[in-house]
Amino acid sequence: MNSQPLRVGIGGPVGSGKTALTLALCLALRDRYNLAVVTNDIYTREDADFLVRNEALAPERIIGVETGGCPHTAIREDASINLEAVDQLNRRFEGLDLIIVESGGDNLSATFSPELSDLTIYVIDVSAGDKLPRKGGPGICKSDLLVINKIDLAPLVGASLEMMDSDTRRMRGEKPFVFSNQKTGQGLEQIIAFIERQGLLTAAA
């Protein structure tokens, strides 16, 4: 059993699929790990409410944080409100294995404080255009895992997945990335394998 839970930060622009990924991870991992979630919204708890409505986890395992300002600040410069939520979950549930911290939607410069997140997953979506990986930024270039979501929309928006693949490799070097479609579950197993491998997670027997 881990003395401290693995904290996985999930960031990305508004509408990229962060909450859908968080839901999918909860449904896939909740029977294998002692799991909890912190979500961030500026003025509401909409993402937390979505997870509760979809029965991602028991409601008491989900804390919705209202940042009241720039979502980037709440995960980077002043992460105190999120750190308090993490501490609250640790006190509430002994022996947590994993806490997912989902940021509010932000721009490509958003990054997590190392005090808040052990691993960072950054989510972008194909509907923003195939040039998005070339724009760079810490999320695209430096996150531990980049998820390129909504690949089913590529034909509808005229995006080239091949171009996104080559541009992402150029921008990220050896850092991993995954193409995904959360509607069908494509890419989810790769994301889970990354979290387990890099986070040294071991499921309870």
From Swiss-Prot:
Any one GO MF annotation of this record: nickel cation binding
Family under the similarity heading: Belongs to the SIMIBI class G3E GTPase family. UreG subfamily.
Subunit composition and interactions: Homodimer. UreD, UreF and UreG form a complex that acts as a GTP-hydrolysis-dependent molecular chaperone, activating the urease apoprotein by helping to assemble the nickel containing metallocenter of UreC. The UreE protein probably delivers the nickel.
Protein name: Urease accessory protein UreG
Compartments, record wording: Cytoplasm
Gene name of this polypeptide: ureG
InterPro entries per the UniProt record, alphabetical: CobW/HypB/UreG_nucleotide-bd, P-loop_NTPase, UreG
Provenance organism: Pseudomonas savastanoi pv. phaseolicola (strain 1448A / Race 6)
A Pfam family: cobW
